[in-house]
Design a protein with these regions (language model features):
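A short, well-structured edge-of-sheet supersecondary motif
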Residues: 1-24, 258-261
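Structured C-terminal helix/loop/strand segments within mature extracytoplasmic catalytic/sensor domains
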Residues: 245-315
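Active-site SXXK
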Residues: 12, 30-56, 83, 130-134, ...
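Active-site helix/loop module of the DD-peptidase/beta-lactamase fold
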Residues: 50-89, 109, 138-173, 177
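Peripheral terminal and inter-domain segments
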Residues: 298-463
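Active-site-proximal alpha-helical segments within enzyme catalytic domains
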Residues: 129-133, 171-194, 249-266
Length: 463
């Protein structure tokens, strides 16, 4: 599994902490994806504490500019609590249902398929609007609104949130911070809003937020980490509660043993449910072994330290070299018209590294890779968004890339973008005589769209 970092904490103290170095360390700013939702919940709790809102308030009352006589009745009935509990009427995210509208407006322009507050149905648009509500009431993003509390618990000043296309903090997915920053936020949650004897966030709100408010067991896919209920932007587990983010951003809370597990990663190439189940079972095994007995500073301690020091990205299943490699080294392959828009490519190979050279609609590109080892560099595109969805960053983003021969004549290139948003593309090149098959499989939200599909190619007559 492509896990970038993890930590176990007991009674607020770090018991184990590891990073997949040299690419990730304690200062790496990591996209937290839907763990962002739990942070938005804290901001809503602060609004409640300051009596700026009531959970029974109708969200439409705060956005009259988007509602009129045509607004669906089920949308008019949505309360703030319904949104926190993921029990709103639309079938899916409003910005997906109405891509023709700004994200904020779209929430109020869709039709409901069920009464508000009746059925759990995961909906990121709800959280996004809650974040916009914070901005509307206090004139700052939910991150900046929580800055006084963050300062007291030691969360870094450089924490930020990616913006939506219409310029609001993307509370459903956009928080970017270090793992240690997120740990500090989680510890505040675990302590029900208290820090050094001071009440920073309302205890009663956090008690409700981290306990079952609504049943989310609505499909034949029970899992102890996610099917025991849902709170206010927190998942209820069989042993406590949790925060989840796409790609294996997780925080598992075990209150009875005062145990916390946090990790970051990019497992978007795999089914997130599978990775989540595997991680939760692994962490649950650790939970079962946790006692009050102190670990001796002997073999056990040294073994733990060695394992955390040696923690790295997953090993490779292929090989570094094959006899066939030299036959295609530097040769040009011309591709038929394809959905990626790639006209031709070459693979250049050395002993330990190489690069994939190709031309698409934006020009000639060069993707450097290590052979059976990751190489850090820049992904050769400037049209990916960074701080705001849909707005090209204009810069090449950081990436790590590796290649391996999975068969004698089949080369797999794995590229992971590790900027303010995470994405990956697996490029498979299968050679047969003078022909080549190309497959690109990407997993990235709102970018890398033309890095997916198949292509048919032949060795160039120039070769």
């Amino acid at each position: 599994m492509n896990i970038h970092s993890f930590a176990f904490l007991r009674r607020g103290f770090v018991a184990a902490e590891a990073y997949a170095k040299p690419f990730f360390d304690e200062n790496f700013m990591h996209r937290m994806y839907s763990c962002s939702k739990s942070v938005v919940s804290l901001a809503v709790g602060k609004l409640v504490k300051e009596k700026r809102i009531r959970l029974t308030d109708k969200i439409c009352d705060y956005f009259p500019e988007y509602t009129d006589e045509n607004t669906d009745e089920s949308i008019k009935n949505i309360t703030i609590e319904d949104m926190l509990e993921m029990s709103v009427p639309p079938l899916t995210d409003a910005y997906a249902l109405r891509p023709d509208l700004p994200w904020t407006e779209s929430f109020f322009k869709v039709k409901g398929v069920k009464p508000s507050g009746t059925i759990f149905d995961y909906n990121s648009s709800s959280t996004f609007i809650l974040g916009v509500l914070v901005e509307k009431l206090v004139g700052k993003t939910f991150i900046d609104y929580l800055r006084p509390e963050f300062d007291k618990i030691g969360v870094g000043e450089n924490v930020y949130c990616v913006l939506s296309p219409d310029g609001h903090a993307w509370g459903g997915s956009g928080v970017v911070c270090t793992m240690r920053d997120f740990i500090k936020i989680c510890l505040l949650v675990a302590e029900r809003g208290k820090h050094d004897g001071e009440i920073l966030l309302p205890e009663d709100y956090l008690a409700r937020a981290t306990s079952k408010r609504v049943s989310n067991y609505t499909r034949n896919d029970y899992a102890p980490r996610k099917s025991e209920g849902y709170g206010y932007q927190f998942w209820i587990t069989d042993k406590g509660y949790s925060a989840y983010g796409m790609g294996s951003q997780y925080a598992f809370f075990f209150p009875d043993k005062d145990l916390l597990f946090v990790c970051t990663g990019d497992t978007q190439v795999a089914a997130d449910d599978f990775c989540g189940e595997f991680l939760y079972e692994w962490v649950s095994d650790v939970y079962d072994e946790v006692t009050d007995k102190k670990l001796d500073e002997g073999d056990d301690y040294e073994n733990l330290k060695r394992k955390t020091d040696e923690f790295s990205l997953p090993d490779f299943c292929g090989v570094k070299q094959t006899p066939f490699a030299e036959e295609i080294n530097g040769e040009k392959y011309i591709l038929r018209a394809n959905e990626m828009g790639i006209k031709w490519f070459r693979v250049w190979l050395n002993n330990d590294d190489g690069f994939f050279e190709y031309e698409n609609a934006r020009g000639v590109k060069r993707l450097n890779f290590g052979l059976c080892g990751y190489k850090q560099g820049k992904f050769p595109e400037t049209n990916f968004y960074s701080r705001r969805v849909g707005i090209p960053s204009g810069i090449e983003q950081d990436c790590i890339v590796a290649a391996e021969w999975t068969e004698e004549k089949k080369l797999l290139i794995r590229a992971y973008v590790i900027g303010s948003n995470f994405g990956n593309v697996f490029i498979t090149l299968g050679f047969k005589g003078d022909e080549v098959g190309v497959a690109m499989n990407k997993k990235a939200e709102f970018f890398m769209d033309d890095y997916e599909g198949f292509a048919y190619g032949c060795l160039s007559a120039e070769s």
